[in-house]
Amino acid sequence: MPAPGSEQDFVVNVGDRVYFDLDSYSVRPEAQPRLDAQAAWLARYPQVTVRIEGNADERGTREYNLALGARRAEAVRTYLIQRGVPAGRIDTISFGKERPIVEGSNESAWAQNRNAHTAIVSGAPR
């Protein structure tokens, strides 16, 4: 069982990743409960800072996917700020298509690689 307030607690009990539709950076309705849980967890542990990492699938140019990943990360950041997380606790970065979580050139892999990952930067034990 992960220790409360730990990075493992966040990953296992809250969830650190939400997914996006093809060529979209709109937060999907099914992602909202996870992001609401992230915001609540971050409110409970105010010393924690996070980085939202925007990702894209392999289709499209490197430049296009870096821009799309940035918009996805910013969409999640905005959502968390609207739920009360102070802006100063959230950084963003885009990895575009450079860091796939699933290898493959099929819809299943692409769907998983279109995501925003909330990574804990500081303030929580592993």
Language model feature labels by segment:
Residues 30, 34-37, 63, 71, ...:
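Extracytoplasmic/secreted proteins, especially bacterial periplasmic and envelope-associated proteins
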Residues 108-112:
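A generic structural micro-feature
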Residues 1-49, 123-126:
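Periplasmic peptidoglycan-binding/tethering modules of Gram-negative envelope proteins
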Residues 102-106:
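Short beta-alpha junctions and helix-cap segments that line functional grooves
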Residues 46-55, 70-101, 114-126:
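A non-catalytic structural micro-motif
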Residues 24, 62, 107:
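Generic anion/oxyanion-binding catalytic loop in active/binding sites
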Residues 58:
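Acidic catalytic loop of the alpha/beta-hydrolase fold
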